[in-house]
Amino acid sequence: MKKKGFIIGGICLAVVAGILGYNHEAVRVVFHNVYSPSVKLDDSSKWNGGKAYEKLPYSEASENDYLDLYVPDSEKPMPLIILVHGGGFVYNDSQSRQAQLMYRYFRDHGYACASVNYRLAQEAAFPAGVEDVKSAIRFLRANAEKYGYDPERFAIWGESAGGYLSVICGASNDEEFNSVPFIGEDENHPVSSEVQMILDYYGCVEFGTMEDDYKELRIPRIVRWAASLWLQGAIKDTGYEDVESYWMRKDVKTLTEDEKN
């Protein structure tokens, strides 16, 4: 029944948006995100078995603070890819369609993967989600030996809202957004939330022009509302207009074309 309700709601949203002349591609993306948490992909034939830990709690701040960890069989510790799902800060979870596609790809190519769930805007606004993800990173580093991956080779990847969270978490230092303790922090303190690579897949990093961009692209008002809900008010009035304010790590740099290749 819940799944049916989401589908009907998504169809209604698409119809209304079409009548009002909104960008049809934007409507498709919104509908896809509304529906995607209900999608369960077929098991991957490339997965070698390894070890899987689903809904592993990393913090006691919320029942939604958990992650799904996948560690392929390997003779030595492997790099860890930390995945942060999108959904406009108001929807999706660690098993969204996008998250499943990404962790399966990396997992099947020999990387350990952790798909992180975090508090959405309707439960707790900015910076709760950022603090949750950084808590998850510290939890993963503290438990690297237990689960079998390399604590010195962490990358964080996020799409859409998850891309925004990934950039802030990766570019800020350990003193920023560290108020959510991870489970076991008392026995492991201090643990760094630093990552060695940040991958942002179409995540917004500058909110200052977002309102104008949304209007120009005829993005549905409900999508514009999501970011405002996340920031607890109109974007231009919050003081959190871009990620640059939190670009604390001096060693962060953009990859050159040669390095990308």
Model-predicted regions and their roles:
Residues 1-16:
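N-terminal Sec-pathway targeting helices
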Residues 15-261:
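Alpha/beta-hydrolase superfamily serine-hydrolase fold, recognizing
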